């Protein structure tokens, strides 16, 4: 889209392009270092912030994603890494499903079938299987999401919109 304006000396019309909107913001060095810790191949990834959420993109597609994101309305692009809260990353549930997740970056809690169903229903889960802090919740070796243990309590970080409602 462009704006038409009259040229005073030529008597005709000239087109002035609209300024592009910038959707992607650079993440600072400390945040980028924390984000790199969460992926297996950080040299192949670049990171950007959209609003308060950080996203990861493969370097090979980064320019195309940026160009499309500035030209078209984008619903979702890249891997949602999460949001920074008091200097630490609060991981997005999509990061648990990312095939390039570095599983050594965070403690993993393996749950049996009954506990996994409780987790997916956002019900209380026993704190015994979890380490202090953020944990990757797994069942049969597959990542389900994240949970945070604080003392003898576990905060379920599974999205409320995805929870299992019926038994």
Residues covered by each model-derived region:
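Polybasic, low-complexity RNA-engagement segments
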Residues: 2-167
């Amino acid at each position: 889209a462009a704006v038409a304006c009259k040229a005073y000396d030529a008597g005709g019309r000239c087109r002035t392009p609209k300024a592009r909107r910038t959707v992607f913001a650079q993440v600072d060095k400390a945040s980028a270092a924390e984000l790199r810790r969460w992926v297996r191949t950080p040299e192949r990834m670049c990171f950007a912030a959209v609003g308060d959420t950080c996203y990861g993109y493969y370097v090979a597609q980064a320019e195309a994603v940026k160009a499309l994101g500035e030209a078209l309305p984008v619903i979702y692009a890249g891997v949602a890494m999460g949001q920074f809260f008091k200097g630490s990353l609060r991981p997005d549930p999509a990061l648990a499903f990312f095939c390039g997740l570095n599983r050594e970056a965070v403690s993993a809690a393996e749950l049996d079938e009954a506990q996994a169903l409780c987790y997916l229903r956002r019900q209380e889960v026993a704190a015994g299987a979890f380490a202090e802090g953020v944990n990757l919740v797994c069942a049969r070796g597959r990542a389900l999401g994240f949970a945070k243990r604080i003392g003898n309590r576990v905060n379920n970080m599974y999205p409320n919109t995805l929870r299992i409602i019926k038994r």
